[in-house]
Every structure is written in C-alpha cells, then in structure tokens.
From Swiss-Prot:
One of the GO biological process terms: proteolysis
Binding annotation for Mn(2+) 1: 316, 384, 414, 428
Enzyme Commission code(s) on record: 3.4.-.-
Protein name: Uncharacterized peptidase C18A7.01
Cellular component terms per the entry's GO annotation: endoplasmic reticulum; Golgi apparatus
Family: Belongs to the peptidase M24B family.
InterPro entries on file: Creatin/AminoP/Spt16_N, Creatinase/aminopeptidase-like, Pept_M24, Peptidase_M24B, Peptidase_M24B_aminopep-P_CS
GO molecular function per UniProt: dipeptidase activity; metal ion binding; metalloaminopeptidase activity
This protein's record includes keyword Nuclease: no
Cofactor note: Binds 2 manganese ions per subunit.
Native source species: Schizosaccharomyces pombe (strain 972 / ATCC 24843) (Fission yeast)
C-alpha cells in the first residue's frame, strides 16, 4: 500500500515539473507575441510615415522644377558690386566692410555656411567707384583673412573675382593691419557686422558709419534671376502644404505634421525648416507659436506657416486649412473669408506703383478686417520684404508712410485674425510688385479645403 506521504511527494514532483514547463511555455508565447507585434509595427508605418506616404505622390513635379533652377551668375554679382560702389560714392564714403553673412552673400557669393563666423575676423571690403581707387569696381574687392586661412579663402573666392588679400598673423591686431594697409578710410559698416569687430575698426583709426538707406535699398529690387529662384522655392513650399492637406486626420500632433512638411521639402531637394509654425485650433491665435504635442480635434483649423530656401533665397507661405471631411461652422467660414478678402485688398495695392506707400498697402488690407468689426484681432503688420533673409526691408506696416512701393519689390502679404483661446487664421503669399502683381506661389488659396 502506497503511503500518503509518498503519493503527495510524487504529486508535488509532477506539479513542479509541469509548472516549470507551463511557465516556460507562457514566457515563450509572451516573447513570441512581443516579437510578432514588433514585426507588425515595422510593416505598419507610424503616423508620420503614413502621412508622408499619402502626401508625397502629389510632390512629384517639384524635384525637376528645383533641379532646373539656375543660381545667380558671375556677371550679376559684378553688377551688384558696381551698383554698391556707385551708391558709396553718392554717400561720400570710401568702402563697405562686411562679414560672411547676407551682404557678403549678395555681393560676393560667400555665406556663413561656407565660412563660419568665429573670433578671427574674415572681412570683405568693397570700394567706392570714386578716386583714389580707379578701375573696374566689379572685381576690386579686398579680403582681410588670417594668414593660415589664405589658401582656403582663395579657394572659396575663386577665380571670378580679382580679389586682393590682406593677411594677419596670430600675434597681430587684424584691424591695425588693415588700417596700416588701407589708411584712414571712411567705412560703412554692414548691419550684420558684430559689435567687437566694429569697435576694433574704430579703435584702429577708421571713421565708421552705419548703412545708408541708399545702400540698404540695393537688395530690395529683385532681378529676373532672383524672381525665378524665389518663384520656384515658393511654389515648392505651397506644393508641400497642398500635398499634405488632404492627408491630415484628427489625432495627428502639431509636431508630427511639422515633421512631415520638412520631409516633403527634403523630397523636393530643399533644406528643412528649423522652426516651422504648425498650430491647431485655439493655439493658432499665437501668430508665431511653435508646434507641440497637441493633437488635432475634429473640425479644427490647421495653420501652417512654413518655408525653405533655394540658393539662399527664402520662401514664406501660410495656409489655414481644414482636413477633408471636416465641417466649418458659419463663424469659421466668415472669418476665413474675411482674411482672404483682406489679402485680396493688399495684393491689389501692389499694382499701384506711382505713389503708393508701404503703409497704404497695409491699411488697405487692415480696413477690410476693421470694417467687419475685427480690427483689434489683426495684431501684426501686413507683411515684409523677402529674399536672402526671411524678413528683410522693406515692411508693410501702418507707420511706413515714407517708403514707396517699387516695381520689383517682393513682399509677403499675410493678414490674420487671432482671437485668444478660440481661433487663429492667417493666409500668406509672396507677391512681386508690378503693374499686375505676380504671385510667386503661383496660386492663392481658394478655401480651407483648397490651399
């Protein structure tokens, strides 16, 4: 007869053996399930990838358009330096001095991207076309450069400019070296020159002046080559917005949508934007708010203010859209149409070139919104100049009464209504002032469903 104790022990051994097997089987199944889910997640794209895959087919025409763009050519840079030299003569100054920022980009095709700013000054000097500096000013440009950087500077400047180089050793004062070489000149200091450099030039003995309106205005009138570049990059920008709009669904976050727009720029052969403005619902009442993890709700406006660059020239475009299948309230539709009508009024003013001031353009658009009772919610200027800088002279604001609109100016026209904690709407296009204003975005928005 088997004792109770031995039966219990055999039963316990059986349970222990089978428990271990069951536990091992459960763990194996759990691990397999995790691996299967991970594999399925790889097969199923995340929100950003799904949105990108939905939008990118509509961008197919953008890469060829960008690839066919032609950069600013050598002769245009020569003409720019000639115009600068003539302006310096008019201002009775000897030269403009600049760092590798936007002005050196404009006059010599050298940018911060190709020569980063540091504590060691690398300066470009373009002279007046007056005596005692005779000859073709188009090629007469000096560069102050650290001696050990001279080969790099020559490679960067290239052979198209007959430049002169003034070098300084590490144990020398670069500003004194420049003064000893050039003498007591009257220098116009470019507005982007850093303060310690401006002070160094003054202490060395140069007489310095700020940038005159005459010189500052040289970049305001865009050449046909500039207009072509800016048109291409603005068309590409609005193409990204139009491509993604039908794909937007409630539940996406502002950051996810901003990431997709940058992915579309890269697909088009363009650089990403560091700070895109993508805002949903009431958050769009902050004109320059940044994207957050806020998720899109049903029947909310989506404001996208985005841009990129081509050969250094900026685009800037804003659309306030509604995802397909979502419905507007009467108030949303009324406010969107009001902003659209204000933009229409502003654009139309850019054809009145004889005696229209920048202030009048702003006030024409502002009047539309004010007359409808929403003037207090249009809280910024109508627009700004656009070019090698995203915001550059001149500005469409009510105080700019003394600056006329000129043929060849490129402005953004971007009225908006911003009601705190409720709604924000802005529509923006880049426009070339002309007898018939030219949209550099090619098409205006037609509705929140057709950006």
């Amino acid at each position: 007869m088997v004792s109770f104790e031995s039966s219990f022990e055999r039963g316990t051994d059986f349970l222990n053996r089978n428990f271990k097997k069951c536990l091992f089987a459960c763990i194996s199944i759990f691990i397999f399930a995790l691996l299967a889910l991970s594999f399925l997640s790889l097969l199923q794209p995340d929100t950003v990838q799904r949105l990108y895959q939905c939008a990118v087919p509509s961008m197919i025409y953008v890469p060829p358009m960008i690839n066919e763009a032609i950069s600013i050519q050598h002769e245009e840079f020569n003409n720019r330096r000639r115009r600068l030299s003539a302006a310096l003569r008019e201002d009775k100054l000897d030269a403009l001095i600049m760092e590798p920022t936007v002005s050196m980009d404009y006059f010599a095709n050298i940018t911060t991207g190709s020569w980063g700013l540091s504590e060691r000054p690398f300066l470009g000097i373009i002279f007046s076309d007056d005596e005692p500096y005779p000859g073709d000013v188009a090629s007469r440009i000096y560069f102050l450069v650290p001696k050990f950087e001279l080969p790099r500077a020559k490679e960067l400047v290239g052979k198209n400019i007959d430049a002169k180089y003034i070098t300084w050793d590490e144990d020398e004062n670069p500003y004194q070296v420049l003064y000893d070489r050039l003498g007591p000149l009257k220098l116009m200091i470019d507005g982007t020159v850093r303060n310690f450099i401006a002070q160094g030039l003054q202490y060395a003995g140069f007489t310095t002046f700020g940038v005159s309106p005459r010189v500052a205005s040289l970049r305001e009138i865009k050449s046909p080559a500039e207009v072509d570049i800016m048109s291409r990059v603005n068309i590409a920008t609005v193409a990204a917005i139009r491509s993604v709009q039908p794909c937007i669904k409630p539940g996406i976050t502002e950051k996810e949508l901003a990431e997709v727009i940058n992915m579309l720029f890269v697909y088009g052969g363009l650089p990403v934007q560091e700070s895109p403005i993508v805002l949903f619902g009431e958050r769009a009442a902050m004109p320059h708010g940044g994207p957050s993890n806020r998720r899109l709700k049903k029947s909310e406006f989506v404001l996208m203010d985005v841009g990129t660059t081509l050969f250094g020239y900026h685009s800037d475009c804003t659309r306030t859209v509604l995802p397909h299948g979502q419905k507007m309230t009467e108030r949303m539709e009324k406010l969107w149409n009001l902003v659209y009508d204000a933009q229409t009024a502003g654009i139309q003013m850019l054809s009145h070139l004889s005696n229209t001031s920048c202030a009048e353009v702003d006030l024409a658009a502002r009047k539309v919104i004010k007359d409808a009772g929403y003037g207090e919610y249009f809280i910024h200027r109508l627009g700004h100049g656009l070019g090698l800088e995203e915001h550059e002279q001149t500005y469409l604001n009510p105080a700019n009464k003394g600056t006329p609109v000129q043929k060849g100016n490129v402005f953004t026209v971007e009225p908006g209504i911003y009601i705190p904690d409720e709604i924000g709407i802005r529509i923006e296009d880049a426009v070339l002032a002309s007898d018939v204003p030219i949209l550099l975005t090619n098409f205006r928005a037609k509705s929140p469903y057709e950006p």
